[in-house]
């Protein structure tokens, strides 16, 4: 048991490095362990026992903060994908869409978030809790940002006034996830820009700029 009395059910002592609050250190270690295990073997590899072993904590410590391994896995993914969705001020709707789609491609191809997303998306098909967390924590906030871009473009006259926001969001981002999961074609910045260009060709207003 650790010095603070929160050792796990396996009686294991928990690792600690100086200079960080114990709770923050443990949470980060758990989330990183969950992410590493999912990259290596999917959600089935990220059991509470395996996460605890890799993080150097007891299972009771994990259950104190998360109800299931799916919840740990999702937060571990969010940790890896932090600060991946921002826009500069004053850009057009067209440029904002390009920035967002290129950012998604970079995240999935240049960081561990790509393998993690593949694992989470696969396991979410048979795990309702994980699927809900994926929608609520990852997809919904990002769709909200992009939807605001589209609404602004429609209001300014850059994009069509009768724009179907939800369908357009699917047209813009679904190709990225399709290539990430199935790997049938290159997932790179050139593809991201081509995708946005094709969508923009159909949603710009007659007076809208490039």
Predicted features along the sequence, with ranges:
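Helix-loop "lid/cap" segments that line or gate small-molecule binding pockets
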Residues: 102-109, 117-126, 196-202
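Tryptophan-centric aromatic hotspots in well-structured domains and transmembrane helices
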Residues: 65-66, 134, 138, 177-178
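Short amphipathic alpha-helical segment with a characteristic S/N-K-E followed by hydrophobic residues
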Residues: 30, 45, 68-73, 83-84, ...
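Hydrophobic alpha-helical connector segments
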Residues: 75, 85-117, 168
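Short hydrophobic/aromatic patch on the recognition helix
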Residues: 56-66
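C-terminal peripheral helix-coil segments that are non-catalytic and often amphipathic
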Residues: 1-15, 99, 140, 144, ...
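Amphipathic alpha-helical packing segments from all-alpha helical-bundle domains
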Residues: 109, 115, 129-155
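Basic, helix-initiating cap at the start of DNA-binding domains
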Residues: 1-56, 71
């Amino acid at each position: 048991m650790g010095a603070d009395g929160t050792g796990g059910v396996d009686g294991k002592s928990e690792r600690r490095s100086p200079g960080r609050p114990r709770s923050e250190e443990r949470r980060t270690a758990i989330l990183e362990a969950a992410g590493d295990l999912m990259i290596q073997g999917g959600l089935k590899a990220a059991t509470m026992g395996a996460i605890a072993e890799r993080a150097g904590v007891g299972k009771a410590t994990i259950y104190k903060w998360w109800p299931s391994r799916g919840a740990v896995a999702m937060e571990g993914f969010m940790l890896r994908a932090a600060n991946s969705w921002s826009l500069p001020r004053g850009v057009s709707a067209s440029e904002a869409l390009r920035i967002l789609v290129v950012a998604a491609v970079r995240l999935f191809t240049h960081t561990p978030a790509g393998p993690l997303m593949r694992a989470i998306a696969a396991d979410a098909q048979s795990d309702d809790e994980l699927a809900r967390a994926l929608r609520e924590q990852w997809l919904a906030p990002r769709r909200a940002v992009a939807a605001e871009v589209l609404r602004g473009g429609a209001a300014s006259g850059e994009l069509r006034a009768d724009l179907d926001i939800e369908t357009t969001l699917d047209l813009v981002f679904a190709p990225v996830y399709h290539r990430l999961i199935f790997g049938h074609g290159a997932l790179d910045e050139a593809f991201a820009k081509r995708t946005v260009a094709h969508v923009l060709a159909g949603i710009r207003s007659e007076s809208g700029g490039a």
